[in-house]
């Protein structure tokens, strides 16, 4: 944990400084966490809902934060778990979470900005269609540029498992792009 993170954690645990420290935490990590969540749930509205739940969990759980990993990694873990929980709630009891890929791919097309070119939309759809664990590994490595060790701390998964998931995700994305190229 860095000195800055230690300072934020200390102030988050102090009732009179909590609000200001939380604002600083969001200023430092909010955008990264939002886009991490957004790539998992796709929809802006869903990402906002997940971020609210994440904020609540961070504030309620800060007392139990032990500093064994960086504050950012700890926040990522909470955001990841909340995003996956959100996806599970969207599923019916009998539909596996990985079956959401098709509907997420459709959301990508609907959420795409007008200036997004076809290649960008295809790429985002390819990622949305990945199985959950591959998508998670891909997003963390490709977009968030996290190391496998950081990813392991966030997900609780073995580094080799994450490397395998990332490798297969890259292969699936390439295959999707080749099959759907103009």
Go through the PLM ranges and name each one:
Residues 1-32, 150, 182:
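N-terminal module of bacterial RNA polymerase sigma factors
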Residues 2-7, 93-116, 120:
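Internal acidic/polar
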Residues 14, 39-42, 53-70, 89-91:
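Sigma70-family region 2
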Residues 26-44, 61, 127, 172, ...:
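Amphipathic, Lys/Arg- and hydrophobic-enriched alpha-helical face
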Residues 35, 49-56, 69-81:
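Structural recognition of an alpha-helix C-terminal capping motif at a helix-to-coil junction
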Residues 64-66, 77-97, 116, 168:
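Arg/Lys-rich amphipathic alpha helix in sigma70-family domain 2
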Residues 84, 126, 134, 149, ...:
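DNA-recognition helix of helix-turn-helix
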Residues 137-141:
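A short pre-motif secondary-structure segment
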């Amino acid at each position: 944990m860095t000195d800055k993170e230690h300072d934020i954690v200390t102030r988050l645990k102090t009732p009179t400084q909590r609000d200001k420290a939380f604002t600083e935490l969001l200023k430092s990590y909010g955008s990264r966490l939002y886009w991490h969540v957004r790539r998992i749930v796709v929809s802006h509205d869903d990402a906002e809902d997940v971020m609210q739940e994440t904020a609540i969990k961070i504030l309620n759980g800060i007392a139990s934060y032990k500093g064994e990993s960086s504050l950012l990694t700890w926040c990522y873990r909470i955001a990841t778990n909340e995003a996956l929980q959100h996806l599970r709630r969207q599923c019916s009891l009998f539909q596996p979470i990985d079956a959401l890929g098709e509907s997420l791919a459709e959301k990508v097309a609907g959420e795409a900005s007008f200036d997004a070119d076809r290649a960008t939309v295809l790429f985002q759809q390819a990622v949305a269609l990945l199985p959950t664990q591959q998508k998670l590994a891909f997003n963390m490595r490709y977009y968030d540029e996290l190391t496998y060790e950081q990813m392991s701390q966030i997900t609780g998964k073995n580094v080799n498992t994450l490397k395998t998931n990332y490798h297969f995700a890259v292969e699936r994305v390439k295959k999707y792009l080749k099959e759907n190229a103009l």
